[in-house]
Structure formats: structure tokens, C-alpha cells
Amino acid sequence: MSDGSNKDPQRALVFATGDIIVDEPDPYSFFEPSLELLSSGDFVIGQIEVPHTDRGEANSTDIPAPPAAPENLNPLKDCGFNLCTTCGNHAHDNGVPGIVDTLDKLRSLGIAVTGTGRNIQEAKTPAIAERKGIRVGLIGYN
């Protein structure tokens, strides 16, 4: 296991997580055990599982997942997340408002996003991040 201390300027340390569901009253507690390690990565990638919105109505053919508050995404910045997909099976559970609010919040935190969008072209646009002169692109489909 890496201690996260990647000082080599020609190598990038990449961390990728699974589904991120940040619906707890204290979203920082969710990340506390991994904050130090994740924040040491050059590229930290996650999959946002539920909409983060205060708008929209539950709209799903699946069992809908309740939306989480947009501010619950704030810890992702502290953890170093810089690339995320939003194309999970619950992406549309709160309709277009849920998608737009989630995208806008992630982008306001400096996180590049792919997988959903205001239109299909935006959804298909790769998320790109650059660190140490290394560019990483991410696409997300479901």
C-alpha cells in the first residue's frame, strides 16, 4: 500500500473509488478514515451515485435514492478529488434539476465531471485534469 508520498515529478499517483454516497448529516465523517491518503494523490477519481440537489421530484423506474444536499459534496475538494463521473443508475432520480445541481456543485469545487449533462454532448464530454504536466481524461457511461 502506498503511503501517498509521490514526489517523483514524472509519475502520478492515482486513486479511484467506487460509488460515493454522501448523505450523512456530517459528510466529513464519511471521508475521515481516508482523507490523508486520498489528499496525497495527484488524480483522485470517484463516482457520484446520487443527485445532490434541493430541487426536483423523485423520478425513477428503479427504487429512487433520496437526493443529498449539494454542500455534502464539499469534502471531496479536501480529499483531492479532481475527476468524477455522475452516470450511475440514480443520476436521473431527481430529473434534470438534480443533474444540473450536482454538476454545478462539483465544478464549483474544481472537480472535472463526465457522464451526465444538460444535453447528450455535455454528458459525453470527457473530464480532464492535469497535474505535474500529466493529463488524465475520464469518460463515464452507464
Question: What do the PLM-derived regions correspond to, one by one?
Answer:
Residues 1-142:
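Acidic, metal/ion-coordinating pockets
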